Amino acid sequence: MRLDEIKIQNFRKHSELIFSPSEGINLIFGPNGSGKTNILEAIHYCALTKGFNRTTDRQCMNFSAESFLLKSLFTSDTGCQYRVHVDFSTNGGKSISLNNSQLEKFSALIGLIPCILFSPAEITIVHGSPQERRRFLDNALCQISKSYLEQLLQYRRILQQRNALLHSSWDRSSPAPDMNIWTELLAESGAFIIKERMDFLDEFQPYFSNAYAILDTGEIPRLTYRSSLGKALVSSDRAGIADSLMHRFGEIQHQEQVRKQTLLGPHRDEILFYLDGSDVKKYASQGQTRTFLIALKVALQRFLFDKKGEQSIFLLDDIFSELDQRRVERVLEMIAGFGQSLITSTEKTGLSFLHEISIHDMLYKHGDPL
């Protein structure tokens, strides 16, 4: 997959901009505040229907504007073209069209244009709450599997309904009459998600170990899935996981009634990161953490390709400030010749094979091609 062109109107710092990257590695450089990251975010919007760091659509509008418009053209590895338009206004909300047909569900776009982001803010994947690591896992799986995306959305709907029942029955001595129905639905959907997540980590581990070995030496990385079932998870097949969930829900029924929320399921699971057996979140240095994160993303690029048969667009925001030059060059060596990458930086010096990279200077006139 590659981005041929994106036209940006009233998005973040850009009142009007046309950006046409080359195939391979593209370097977007310019001073801080020039809008480099905003270009990557606009591309991310068109590929995955949302911006960075869970920002709202309204926050992405240019100052004093009442709307923004993104028009993009992508071409797949097989030559199929996808025209994606994202239109947002304070009055009309957000609409997304694909090849001139408006999407009823934005989720229909997910996975069509594989896209991977690395940015300094994503350090929360390592240091943040378990929700951040679950989100990393879910974002990857949703780009691979439509079934997973549909089950994840369904699980969230069921969870919301079950929590509403728990909240409304706080003054009852017994569960709401239809609670068991929602519990069974939640267990079935939750078992699917847990199984897919565990299988993903098992398959992804060799890709990640290889990427980390290229970027660093000696340390052995490991990814581990920790279910909220704990020792109650006695089976790794879907039916067994669902049975374990149902049994455990029965055991914690009173606790859930007291706390008025669902205390068990994939929405409470954790992914643990280790280096040589030590918890990365607790013991890794800043350099180790950054290397761990970029290795995750580079490995994901290869993994998505093997799963989908389509190369991903790789967005790397301010990578030069996050890694030393040796690791930066190793990252570039790994992604060179493997799909399209777009990198932002405040400088363009210090790279041994800079001649192999397309340079885009942010010192442009608004409305002119970059």
UniProtKB/Swiss-Prot annotation:
Main subcellular localisation: cytoplasm
PROSITE patterns, alphabetized: RECF_1, RECF_2
Keyword Phosphoprotein included in the entry's annotation: no
UniProt keyword annotations, A-Z: ATP-binding, Cytoplasm, DNA damage, DNA repair, DNA replication, DNA-binding, Nucleotide-binding, SOS response
Pfam family of the protein (one): SMC_N
A molecular function GO annotation: single-stranded DNA binding
Record-annotated membrane-spanning stretches: none
GO process annotations (BP): DNA replication; DNA synthesis involved in DNA repair; double-strand break repair; SOS response
Binding site for ATP: G30, P31, N32, G33, S34, G35, K36, T37
Gene Ontology cellular-component terms listed: cytoplasm
Compartments where located: Cytoplasm
Family statement: Belongs to the RecF family.
Entries under PANTHER family matching the protein: DNA REPLICATION AND REPAIR PROTEIN RECF
Function: The RecF protein is involved in DNA metabolism; it is required for DNA replication and normal SOS inducibility. RecF binds preferentially to single-stranded, linear DNA. It also seems to bind ATP.
Protein's name according to its UniProt entry: DNA replication and repair protein RecF
